[in-house]
């Protein structure tokens, strides 16, 4: 299954919700610091409910630390951004892909955008809407990748 990477997430309930989605889908969750909260934050724990024991959680102190880990594992690093040039529906996912999303306020740091194998976007037909909620985006991306990978085999 693909892996999910959150770079500098800021809002504990979003990350908790994403952790619950990762538990439900069997997806590794990689958090890249600095975070906008402590891992013991009560809102983070509450959003993840009692599913935390089922979350395959990995914490990296910095982008550089994560990059070293990712390079050791291999696979495509897929950045998600409102300015992405490839529609996420049109991308053919592989089980070794890493789906990477940035913070709720700043998106992906430029160095992570530059490192991405592809920069994907989730289309939004209403230009007045700047972005989707991070937890919603993560769920949309994970379930599309999962749908494609199940249909392949």
Swiss-Prot record:
Similarity field: Belongs to the class IV-like SAM-binding methyltransferase superfamily. RNA methyltransferase TrmH family. TrmL subfamily.
Source species of the chain: Synechocystis sp. (strain ATCC 27184 / PCC 6803 / Kazusa)
Keyword Disulfide bond on entry: no
Residues binding S-adenosyl-L-methionine, per UniProt: 102, 122, 131
Alphabetic keyword roster: Cytoplasm, Methyltransferase, S-adenosyl-L-methionine, Transferase, tRNA processing
Protein name: Putative tRNA (cytidine(34)-2'-O)-methyltransferase
One of the record's GO molecular function terms: RNA binding
An example Gene Ontology biological process: wobble position ribose methylation
EC identifiers of the protein: 2.1.1.207
InterPro entries referenced in this protein's UniProt entry, alphabetically: Alpha/beta_knot_MTases, SpoU_MeTrfase, TrmL, tRNA_m1G_MTases_N
Stated role: Could methylate the ribose at the nucleotide 34 wobble position in tRNA.
GO cellular component: cytoplasm
Catalytic activity: cytidine(34) in tRNA + S-adenosyl-L-methionine = 2'-O-methylcytidine(34) in tRNA + S-adenosyl-L-homocysteine + H(+); 5-carboxymethylaminomethyluridine(34) in tRNA(Leu) + S-adenosyl-L-methionine = 5-carboxymethylaminomethyl-2'-O-methyluridine(34) in tRNA(Leu) + S-adenosyl-L-homocysteine + H(+)
Subcellular location: Cytoplasm
Root EC class: transferase
């Amino acid at each position: 299954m693909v892996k999910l990477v959150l770079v500098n997430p800021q809002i504990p309930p979003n990350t908790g919700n994403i952790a619950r989605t990762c538990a439900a889908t069997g997806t590794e969750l990689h958090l890249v610091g600095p975070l906008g909260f402590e891992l013991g934050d009560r809102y983070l724990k509450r959003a993840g409910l009692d599913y935390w024991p089922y979350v395959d959680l990995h914490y990296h102190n910095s982008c550089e630390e994560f990059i070293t880990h990712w390079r050791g594992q291999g696979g495509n690093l897929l950045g998600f951004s409102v300015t992405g040039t490839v529609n996420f529906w049109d991308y053919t996912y592989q089980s070794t892909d890493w789906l990477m999303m940035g913070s709720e306020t700043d998106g992906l740091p430029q160095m992570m955008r530059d490192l991405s194998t592809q920069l994907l976007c989730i289309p939004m037909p209403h230009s007045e809407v700047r972005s989707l909620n991070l937890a919603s985006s993560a769920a949309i991306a994970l379930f599309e990748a999962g749908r494609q990978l199940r249909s392949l085999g």
